Every structure is written in C-alpha cells, then in structure tokens.
Amino acid sequence: MSEEEKKVYLEDWRSAKEWGGFLYSIERWERIAEVEKIVCNACKEICLGLREEELLGLLAEGGMKKTLKEEFSEDKAKDARYLEYIVVDDVLLLDAHREYGGEVTKELVRQMLLGKEGKDIDKRYVDRVAGVVRERQRKREEETERSVKELVGDEEKAKSKEEKAKSKRGRKGKSASAPSEQEEEKKESEVEEAEQGGEVEALPVEVGGARSKGGKKKSKGGRKCFKIHRRVLRWTKSPEKIKEEWDKGSEERWKGRSLEEIKEQKIVHDITGVLELLRSEDADRFFMDAGKYRKGGSERQRMVAIGALETGGQRMTGVVEVGTFKDGDGCPVVYHLRFKPTSIGSIGDVINPGVVEASDVGRVDEGEECEDADKFVYPKGVRFETVKETGSFQIVWKNPSDTSEVLRRLIVYCRPCVI
C-alpha cells in the first residue's frame, strides 16, 4: 500500500469510527428517547384537548401547507395523508422543554403540526414562541381576575340591596326621606343596567339582505369584490323551483333528483350569507387558500374554512368550500359554495387538490348572468342574520313567524394561530 493509499485509508477509517461512535452513543439515544417521549405526550395533550372542529382546523392547515409545497422527490408519501416528517434539533427541543416547560414545548409541537419547517426552528424562534405563550397566559390570568372581581361585585351589590330592604321593612310608617331613598334605589338600578348594557354589542344593522350583529360598520375600502354565479343563487330558492331549474339545466349531475334530495342538498348549499365573511377584510383569518387548477377551459381557485352546521337537532362538523373563477373584468365569481360534513379521517380527501379537481363540475357557463355579492338579498320571507365574533362567524336562519326559533346555524371558525 502506497503512502497516498494509506493516508486515504486512515482518513476513511477515522471518519467511520467517528460516525460509528455517534450512531452508537448511549447518551445520544437516551436524549432522543427523552425528546420522543416529550413530543408524543405533547401531541396527545394537543389532540385530546381540542374540540372536533379545532382538530379539523389543525389537520387541514398543516395538510394544506404540505400539499401546496413543491415536491422534492418522486415518493408517494403525500398520498398517505400524513404530514411529512421534519428534521429538528433534538438538543434544542430538550433545552426548550427544560428552560420553559411543557406549555412552550406543546406550542412548538403544535406549530410543527401546522406546517412549520424544522430548519426555521432555532433558539430565536423558541424564544419567540415562549413570549407568545407567556402573553397568552397573562391575558388568561387577567380575564380570570376580572371575572372574579365581577362576581364579587355582584355579590356585594346583592348584599347591599338585601340590607337596604331589611332596613326599609324595619321602619315604621313612611318617613320624609323615603321618596329620596326610592329615587336612590332607582338610580342604582339604572346604573347597573347601563353597566350590563355596556357589554352588549351595537344593535343589528342591515347587511346584504341580512341582519348583521358585530359592532361598528366598517368602511367599504377594505372589502373584497365578488360576484355570485346563478348556480349558487339557485339554492336560495324554494326546493320546487330549484328542482325545476336543475331539470331544465345542462348539468347532468343534478337532473332528475327527487324533491327530498333537493331539500337535503339545499341545507348544505344555501349558505350564501358566507359571502359577507368572504368579502370582509379579515377573510384570510377564516379561509385558507386550497390552490388553483384548470378545468372546463377556465382557471379555478378554491378556498376552504372549518365550520359546523346545526340543523334539525343535529350538529355536523366539516368544511365550507368556495370555488371561484375570474370574469372578463378580473372579478372573482363564486360558482361553488357548500358546507361539506367531514370527519377527522376524511380531511385528507377534502384538501387534496387531485380529489377536488376530479369531483368538481366539468364546465361552468361563464357567460351566465352573475350578481354582485354586495347587492345580494334573500327572497322575501327568509329571515337570517350574521353574527361576527372574535373567533367565529355565524349565519343564523330563523323562523319568520317566530324569530325566537332557530332553523339552522352555520358557524365558520377562525384558522389556528401560526407563529
């Protein structure tokens, strides 16, 4: 063996020895086992602590990011409907757990499930997540303290009223000061009502043919432009009229459907009030981009949001699907709108572009008359209102004869927080 060959051999041997020592390091494998246990426990706590719609949102958000990523190889891991594995520094995770505790570790794991890449998780990011968790805990403590103070205040007011009532009953006859005491009690009562009324939002206002509850009206500057295709507007009509129009139409999938089928489909398709949210400036907080594709000669875009539909004493969780194409002026036209009941196990199909494209309507008549979303008004006799809250948007359909009776309720949930 020449000196040169010997040198190469020794370098290879030294490298193999170092790599072997790394692979068979007991300390390293103990550390990995500890990190795996921490991550598995965090996943368990996350999944068990979420409501069904929250878990759907978590899986949909992470799965959507994975699906839209550029494929790096020819493997079919995506078809398994799992999030791809990520490579993350085990020492960093273990140090974060020891320094900040389980809540921060759990949030780090949640962000990984939401699609955070391992290369983006460094010490700076860990500190940032820890700050978010601390702020969240601080707000929670403040809210708890505020609730306790309000409860104590209510008890003190009730006690004060009771003492005054006893004192009043103990007096004999009417005193000259009685009228002033009655006025004082009346003023206190008015103050209490005003304090309670301060927590109630502004009175309902008319928005797009609906009554909208949700504080101050926003300017139209931040609102988005949308048009509604006739095939979407059709579902706002009576079941008999819907069946008549579908039977005369060109879409084979809807021809010949029974009236009972039409009634069932109307429940999940007649949700045009969702456009009030879709047009708002914070629509991206609720809807996630599900990608674009070409079909039937047009480029189509799809958006989905997690929701729940309450009707007939039942509650279904699923996704709100929105399909659009752009007209000649570049304005998005909503040609597909539906609530799709979805289980945890089938969320992969709902967000898979290939499955969606295959099931989408073949051709949409882009020349059909469309209506501006801001001019949409439900047919006479339909009573519904929209209610916008911090983490959700609700559309409530009521009985026109008895508005205390809720016929249907669609709740659209805000997307999970990505740090």
From Swiss-Prot:
Which residues fall in a compositionally biased region of kind Basic and acidic residues? 136-165
Q: Where is the composition biased (Basic residues)?
A: 213-222
Span list, region Disordered: 136-222
In this record, what's one Pfam family? DUF1609
> Entry's InterPro entries?
DUF3654, UPF0329
Question: In which family does this protein belong, per the annotation?
Answer: Belongs to the UPF0329 family.
Query: What's the name of the protein?
Result: UPF0329 protein ECU07_1890/ECU10_0010
Q: Which organism is it from?
A: Encephalitozoon cuniculi (strain GB-M1)
